[in-house]
Regions:
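Signature of the chorismate-utilizing enzyme
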Residues: 1-174
C-alpha cells in the first residue's frame, strides 16, 4: 500500500490554479471536480496528466468487449475520476435488452498528485503517493505565471468530439 502524502499550499482560487495547470501541462487530461462552497459542495479537486486510464466498451458477448466491473475490481490505489455508464449494467443484468452505445461503459483516469481545495475555509493541499511527482508539480506551479488572461479563449466547440449524434443520444436516454 502506497502512503498518501499531503502538503498544505498557500491558498489560491481553483480557477487560477487550473489556468496554471493548463498552461504547464495542456488541457488534455485536466480534470476539475467542482464545488459551490456549500456544505455539500465544499471541495474542489484538480488533477492533470493522468498516470493511468481505463476504458471499457461493448456488451457481453461482443468481440473486444470488456467488463467494466471486472476492471474496477483490479484498479490500483490512487485518485480515480471518471464515469460508469448506465449501460454498464448489461454486465450485471444480461437478461435485459441493452442498446449498443458508442460511449464507453467505463472511462476513468488516475491522477497522482491531485490538488484539493476547501472552499469554505480557503485551504489548499497537494496530495499524492509519489513524493517526486508532488515536488515536481509544486516546482512547476511556483514558476508558472499566476495571472489569468484578460482575453480568455472561448470554449472551442468545434474541437469537441461527439460520440453520438442527436438521435442516438435521444434513443439512449429513452
Amino acid at each position: 500500500m502506497n502512503r498518501l502524502h499531503r502538503q498544505k499550499m498557500p491558498w489560491r482560487a481553483p480557477v487560477m490554479v487550473a489556468a496554471q495547470l493548463a498552461a504547464l501541462y495542456g488541457e488534455e487530461g485536466l480534470i476539475w471536480l467542482d464545488g459551490d462552497g456549500s456544505a455539500l459542495g465544499r471541495w474542489v479537486t484538480l488533477g492533470v496528466t493522468p498516470v493511468e486510464t481505463v476504458c471499457c466498451r461493448g456488451r457481453p458477448g461482443e468481440p473486444g468487449a470488456s467488463n467494466p466491473f471486472e476492471a474496477l475490481r483490479h484498479l490500483e490505489e490512487g485518485h480515480w475520476t471518471g464515469w460508469l455508464s448506465y449501460e454498464a449494467a448489461a454486465w450485471s443484468e444480461p437478461g435485459n435488452a441493452w442498446c449498443a452505445d458508442a460511449m464507453p461503459s467505463l472511462w476513468i483516469a488516475r491522477h497522482d498528485p491531485i490538488l484539493r481545495f476547501d472552499l469554505q475555509n480557503q485551504h489548499l493541499w497537494i496530495e499524492g503517493t509519489n513524493p517526486n511527482s508532488i515536488t515536481a508539480m509544486l516546482d512547476s506551479l511556483a514558476t508558472a505565471p499566476t495571472a489569468l488572461s484578460t482575453n480568455p479563449h472561448p470554449i472551442a466547440l468545434d474541437a469537441w468530439t461527439h460520440h453520438t449524434d442527436r438521435s442516438g443520444f435521444a434513443n439512449g436516454v429513452r
